[in-house]
């Protein structure tokens, strides 16, 4: 690939970074990136066939939007160039982990309750849907939370079930540190497919 190589023609007016930081609602820029996470993992070399239930993208990792017209390799890199992997390649790698249904609901509550104060933690999800009431007490704002299947059907979340979640390394570390920052009040622990806590998230990086 070269920087000016055209990857796609775009006729969509994508959300701006300003909108993502000032409006607490679904944004098409976050949606397309989270959808791309799932596509990348399910088409990666060595994919084990376990479908991805949820992909999570926080607004703080999105560095640029896409304008109408040509979308080049450089445009894509600029939009998501934050961080570096242990392989030395720019951009945080994608990681694969598992969360319980209860933890997915907590992630939704974190977005509903905290992201207005910490806009970089605003979450854009593929597969996870929720509604909230901004006038309710903090950590009690979410009024409905569920998954969406491949055909758009509603899937109820089971609190004790493990769900396959894909995000980038930065986000995985951020979510995993919630328990430490809240002194255990909020518990959100990335796990492997057997439910064992993951000690080093970099070991879960998706490598093509």
Residue ranges of predicted features:
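Catalytic centers of hydrolytic enzymes
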Residues: 1-208
């Amino acid at each position: 690939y070269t920087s000016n190589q055209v990857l796609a023609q775009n006729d969509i007016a994508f959300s701006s970074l300003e909108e993502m930081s000032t409006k607490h609602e679904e944004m098409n820029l976050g949606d397309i990136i989270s959808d791309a996470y799932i596509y990348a993992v399910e088409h990666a070399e060595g994919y084990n066939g376990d479908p991805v239930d949820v992909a999570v993208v926080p607004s703080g990792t999105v560095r640029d939007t896409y304008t109408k017209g040509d979308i080049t390799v450089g445009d894509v890199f600029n939009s998501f160039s934050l961080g570096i992997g242990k392989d030395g390649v720019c951009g945080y790698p994608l990681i694969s982990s598992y969360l319980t249904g209860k933890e997915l609901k907590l992630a939704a509550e974190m977005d509903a309750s905290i992201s207005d104060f910490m806009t970089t933690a605003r979450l854009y999800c593929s597969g996870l849907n929720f509604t909230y009431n901004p006038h309710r007490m903090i950590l009690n704002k979410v009024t409905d939370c569920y998954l969406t299947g491949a055909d758009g059907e509603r899937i109820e979340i089971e609190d004790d079930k493990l769900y396959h979640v894909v995000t980038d390394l930065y986000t995985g570390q951020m979510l995993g540190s919630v328990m430490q920052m809240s002194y255990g009040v909020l518990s959100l622990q990335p796990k492997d497919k057997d439910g064992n806590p993951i000690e080093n998230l970099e070991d879960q990086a998706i490598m093509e």
